[in-house]
Structures are given as C-alpha cells and as structure tokens.
Amino acid sequence: MRRRYKQGERFVGVGIAMPFEIWEWESEVAAPPGALGDWRDVDVAAEVTRQTRLPAMLANDATAACGAELAHLDRGLHSDFLYFFIGSFVGGGIVLNGALFAGRSGNAGAVGSMPVYVGGRTSQLIQHASLMVLEKALLKSGQDASLLQDPEADWTAIGPPLRSWMDRVSESLAAAIVASMSVIDFPVVRIDGAMPRSVLSKIIAETRARIGRLDRQGLTPFEITAGTIGADARALGGAMLPILANFTCDPEVLLKDVSATTVAGA
C-alpha cells in the first residue's frame, strides 16, 4: 500500500467501503469462532492514512452504494427512495429530500437487520437475501462457488440452488419492503446487487409478484425498480467519499462521522 507520490500528483484522499462489525457475522460466513475478532481493534481508516499519508474515509459498503446510486440520478425526479443492495450481505440505505438519510446514529437504512417472517419463522433479512446464503448452498451441494465472484458471468449453470435462492430472496425482500412502507411512504424502491442483470431482473419481477399477494391495506402505492450501477456501486460510492468531503456544500450528504474518519451506515 505504501508508495512514493510524484510531484504534481493530486490526491484528495482515500475512500473505503466495507461491511461494518464483520466480527458479528462469523457464523454466517462459516468462519471459525474468534477468527474475525481481531477486526474489533483495527481502525481501518487510520491504518490506511498511516500507510498512505492521505486522509481516509470509511463508509458502510451498502450505504456507499446507495450514495453512488443517488449521485447517478436526477435528484429532482428521484428525491425519495428506499435502496437495497444484495452483496455478500444484503444492506441498503434511505434517501429523503434528495439526500442520504443517516439517522441519529448513522445507522438508518440497516435493512439487513430487519426481521422478516420466512419459512415459518422470524429471522433477519440478511439470513435470506444475501449472496453468502447462495454460496453456502453451492458448497453444500458440492458445486464451485467461485462463479459468484463474477457478476458478469452466466449463472444459469448453477441450476436449482440459484432458483431456490432467488425464491428465498424475493419472499424476504417482499416482506421487508412492505414493512418499510408502513414507516415511510417511499414512492420508489431501488434494488441492485453484485450479480448478473438477468438474475437481478428475475428477483425484482418475483418480488413485485409476491408483494402483490401481500396485504397492503393502508399503504400508498410504490414502484420497484432496478438500481442503475450494478456490482460496482459499493466501490464507486467509496471512491466518492473524499470528493464529497472536500467539494460539496454539504459534505455529510454521504458522510456521517463516528470517529474522525469513519462513516456509519446501513
């Protein structure tokens, strides 16, 4: 990571997008107990600053993806929406009045922790609508899960595990979306993810169908649409952090400080 900067080079800083509190998800990623514990004591932004001598800003990866989505839209036409990003862990964000809404603690839009009733029991959305769930299914069936690292690949060869996972994702997303609408009447829900667009399109179509079968009495109508960026949304959102911090009238449009350089999020 260390390097010597040439005279004339201009760097605003380093933006980092990553899941928060990853030590809390050892069982979900099949890590041995305690294997991720060391991350508790690592200040990632401070370490990057130490090695690069550049200001480093850290954001939750799903929050960063939501910020990137917002930056690519006409805020006059898309001023309010709920955002889901399906990555290794599902996450998301909230946009209100054309700005990312971080909430009191910076953790607004933590959709992965939302309770959903799926398969006869209540559990968190993250346990259903995450790519790690599909990865576990592939490994259990003896298939190579490395294909999931390429969102541009053809995933049709995965077969039944993919179909089963997509059903599970759409069922849990439908429940989470309808529950969210009872709190804030978003006109639009945008769903994106690190997967082929064909897979995302099928998930969105099935989610719409499942929502149509749920009791939505008392809720205002809303639209469900695909995100505009795809798998790169998290990286683009992270790259935007130093620019937003230095060159916008409202540097907290995506940034919500928890420490000097850390951004909390969904």
Predicted regions and their residues:
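ATP-binding/phosphotransfer module of carbohydrate and carboxylate kinases, centering on a glycine-rich
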Residues: M1-V12, W25, R50-R53, H72-D74, ...
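Phosphate-binding/catalytic loop of phosphoryl-transfer enzymes
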Residues: R10-R121, G237, L241, N246-A266
